[in-house]
Design a protein with these regions (language model features):
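Formylglycine-dependent sulfatase
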Residues: 1-157
Length: 157
């Protein structure tokens, strides 16, 4: 069994073709038809970092401690979330894209991989927050390419 969990950042809930919009999203439309869609979800917070921590952990912001952007999720709490549970159950887990469980402009720097510039260690691939393999967009709002892209490409471009 394969589980592909897709989240997007700062978009309306009805912005995809499978939601009736005119935009063409054929691959996402096919996945939506064949899979499970969570169409009645409510975000636990107005900004993305606490919301992403809640998705990973299943906890509300006042429980996992990330109440605003710039507050890093404790890796021990993150590792106990769904990715860690799937990993312990024998699934191969991975994360590709912008995780935003921590930031380089955090109020309390923790030294997690997301707190480094993306060109410092482009070949690092985890483990992280319960995921065995990660390919992160580090500093999720980069406007410059990394100095040494891994395997010749990078998700920031």
């Amino acid at each position: 069994m394969n589980i592909v969990f897709i989240t997007s950042d700062q978009q309306r809930g009805d912005c995809y073709g499978f939601e009736g919009r005119k935009v063409k999203t054929p691959h996402l439309d096919a996945m939506a038809r064949a899979g499970t869609r969570f169409s009645a979800c409510i975000t636990p917070n107005l900004v993305c970092q606490p919301s992403r921590a809640s998705i990973l952990t299943g906890l509300l912001p006042y429980t996992h401690g990330v109440s605003d952007n710039g507050i890093d999720l404790d890796p021990k709490v993150g590792e106990a979330g769904f990715a860690g549970a799937f990993t312990k159950a024998g699934y191969r887990t991975g994360y590709i894209g912008k995780a935003h469980f921590a930031t380089s402009h955090t109020f309390k720097p923790t030294g997690t991989p997301e707190c480094r510039n993306s060109d410092q260690d482009p070949d690092w691939n985890g483990p992280y927050m319960g995921f065995e393999h990660v390919e992160l967009v580090v500093e999720g709002h980069n406007h410059w390419p990394p100095m040494k892209p891994p395997r010749g490409q990078h998700y920031e471009r």
